[in-house]
Design a protein with these regions (language model features):
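Hydrophobic alpha-helical connector segments
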Residues: 46, 57-86
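C-terminal peripheral helix-coil segments that are non-catalytic and often amphipathic
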Residues: 116-128, 146-190
Length: 190
């Protein structure tokens, strides 16, 4: 059901997708959807949470790591870009739906804010700087959503490396520090 909803929301749009269409695409009865989800909003919320929870869990674990902050930040960015590029449907485009601004998606926004805060903490620690670059870092990470939309055959591994390196450049790391961050094994790398 979630796969069918994701495909329809990302291609047809949220408003234009009915629970009947989701049920048909999933090969289930419409009543089955309502047995598990209160409606379309609940389906969309679950899809949105699935794009942010794994990254936040990793970010929380990395926050307490002993590896250099640049290595932990590089690892988080690399994993987050991989998550946003995973699967047959570009779920990141759901972030851009106007409906997502609604109050019913407050849990998603709260988790995304926590992720942005973790990015800020790691970015500040990696640079020993005082300014908050979390929003810029998250913006660079989430830029893969548009790249994936425009380039369906994206070389994900190359993009993961490029974005992770780019984030470290953004926070002021030198080429030597970036090379070290790439080389340091991080215990929670995914």
């Amino acid at each position: 059901v979630l796969d069918a909803a994701a495909a329809l929301f990302c291609t047809v749009g949220f408003t234009s997708t009915s629970t009947r269409a989701i049920a048909d695409a999933a090969g289930v009865r419409q009543a089955s959807i309502y047995h598990h989800f209160a409606g379309k909003d609940a389906l969309l919320l679950e899809l949105l949470l699935g794009t942010v929870r794994p990254s936040l869990e990793l970010a929380d674990a990395l926050a307490t790591g002993t590896e250099p902050a640049a290595a932990r930040l590089w690892t988080l960015v690399h994993a987050d870009v991989g998550l946003l590029c995973a699967g047959p449907v570009n779920l990141g485009v759901l972030y851009m739906l106007p409906e997502v601004a609604g109050e019913q998606f407050a849990e998603f926004h709260a988790l995304r804010s926590r992720l942005r805060a973790r990015y800020s903490e790691l970015a500040t620690a990696a640079d020993d700087g005082a300014d908050d670059r979390g929003a810029l870092v998250l913006g660079l990470v989430e830029s893969v959503i548009v790249r994936r939309r425009d380039t369906p055959d994206l070389d994900v591994a190359a993009v993961q490396d490029a974005v992770a390196d780019g984030v470290l450049r953004l926070v002021g790391c030198t080429p030597a520090e970036i090379a070290l961050a790439r080389a340091v094994p991080v215990a929670l790398a995914v």
